[in-house]
């Protein structure tokens, strides 16, 4: 019996990588200016989950600045006006997501395909209709503490909130070496929390440690 080689093909992240880091930040607050600057400084990419229907809050970045401020990062939906959608009729939920998606696409000039559930609120019925609304991934509030890929990209739990042992998680992620597995570190939060807690140094230290790898 003759032997022959069977090729082994692995799914990889872009560039053939087996590990990736992503950051997910909600609400488009003024502190995003500083957060985006940090990400850009250390070569880190993030997703910013925004509301195209909130143009009256001076704590938020003006809508007409979205295209420039978030250039180079993903922009995703956070619904049009941030209602607690599990309490809303499904028709209204669809309107909230579609209006936000279309509004954001007009503002930034590129496709919007992600969602972060506002107030962490969602239901199985909402999940089921997301593909018909053009949404391919959606983040929830609970976290996993690990670096595996999600079973359902429309109910995507991140690794940790940035107040949840961020540096400890970052060091553990950096030490992962088995290339036969896919690993993702997924951090989420709100940029204003750094101001509220006076702990911007937490993100600065993390970005400096993890960036450029």
Question: For each predicted feature, which ranges?
Answer:
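A short acidic, amphipathic alpha-helical/loop segment
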Residues: 10, 34-38, 65, 125-129, ...
């Amino acid at each position: 019996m003759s032997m022959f080689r069977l090729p082994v093909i692995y799914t990889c992240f872009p560039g053939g990588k087996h590990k990736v880091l992503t950051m997910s930040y909600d609400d488009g607050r003024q502190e995003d200016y500083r957060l985006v600057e940090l990400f850009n400084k250390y070569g880190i990419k993030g997703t910013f989950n925004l509301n195209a229907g909130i143009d009256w809050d001076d704590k938020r970045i003006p809508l007409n600045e979205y295209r420039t401020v978030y250039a180079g990062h993903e922009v995703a939906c956070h619904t049009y006006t941030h209602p607690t959608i599990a309490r809303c009729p499904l028709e209204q939920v669809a309107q909230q997501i579609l209006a936000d998606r279309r509004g954001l696409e007009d503002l930034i000039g590129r496709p919007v395909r992600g969602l972060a559930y506002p107030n962490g609120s969602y239901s199985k019925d909402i999940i089921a209709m997301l593909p018909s609304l053009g949404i391919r991934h959606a983040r929830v509030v609970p976290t996993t503490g690990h670096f595996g890929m999600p079973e359902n990209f429309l109910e995507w739990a991140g690794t940790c909130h940035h107040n949840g042992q961020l540096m400890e998680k970052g060091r553990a992620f950096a030490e992962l070496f088995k290339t036969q597995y896919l690993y993702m570190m997924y951090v989420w939060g709100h940029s204003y929390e750094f101001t509220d807690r006076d702990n911007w140094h937490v993100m600065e230290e993390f970005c400096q440690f993890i960036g450029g790898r």
